[in-house]
A protein has these predicted regions:
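Short hydrophobic/aromatic patch on the recognition helix
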Residues: 41-52
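Short, basic, alpha-helical segments at the C-terminal edge of helix-turn-helix-like DNA-binding modules
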Residues: 34, 64-71
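Amphipathic alpha-helical segments used for helix-helix packing
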Residues: 91-119, 123, 148-159
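Hydrophobic alpha-helical connector segments
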Residues: 61, 72-99, 123-124, 146
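Amphipathic alpha-helical packing segments from all-alpha helical-bundle domains
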Residues: 88, 109-148, 166-176
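Basic, helix-initiating cap at the start of DNA-binding domains
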Residues: 1-40, 57-60
Length: 192
């Protein structure tokens, strides 16, 4: 997998490509056309391919960037909103996945394989999402359980087994059920 850009000019191009790709993420993965994204972003196609060899790489990189931004917001909201921050962070991850079918398709299709370059991206995505939720919950186990719940609920919405409203309500309930566990972990950590 290509390295992340290191110079300010490269970072600017990289960001422009990701911003252009965000619109395609709202459609399906089959609608992600790197040539079209190159044109929209004003970045040469060869440069786009250098950073993102496939549409999968592009969509996973977009999601990684979104999670990175969310993690920063989670730090400030956890301090300001306490237990309510947990539901906010988890709900935001849920909505990112539901509202971006191309990203969700990549997450479903890509698997952890030793020699696949998307594996590194998937590891980064998992770490970022777990950290963002763990910051809000102060409990790594609760974070993993909630992220697995998000995955199941996204699939249920996609398969039309649940409405978006029903899935949101279930996710709020899961956060409420796990928030006392997280609050207890915080209290135990402070008293130790």
């Amino acid at each position: 997998m290509a390295a992340r850009p290191s110079t300010p000019r490269q970072r600017l191009r990289y960001t422009r490509v990701l911003e252009s790709a965000a619109g395609c993420a709202r459609k399906g993965l089959e609608s992600v056309d790197l040539a079209e994204i190159s044109e929209k972003s004003g970045v040469p196609l060869g440069t786009v391919y250098r950073y993102f060899p496939t549409a999968n790489h592009l969509m996973l990189s977009l999601y990684r960037q979104q999670l990175d931004e969310l993690q920063g917001r989670a730090r400030t909201s956890a301090a300001s909103f306490g237990g309510k921050a947990l539901a906010g962070v988890v709900m935001e991850i849920f909505h990112m996945r539901v509202m971006q079918p191309a990203v969700e398709q990549c997450l479903r299709r890509c698997v952890y394989l030793k020699d696949k370059d998307t594996t590194e991206l998937l590891h980064e995505i998992d770490a970022l999402s777990e950290t963002a939720v763990a910051i809000a919950s102060d409990d790594a186990v609760a974070a993993r359980v909630l992220l697995l719940t998000v995955t199941g609920l996204v699939q249920s919405v996609r398969n039309r087994r649940l409405s978006l409203f029903e899935a949101e309500e279930d996710l709020k309930k899961a956060c409420t059920m796990l928030a006392p566990v997280a609050a207890g972990a915080r209290a135990a950590h402070r008293s130790a």
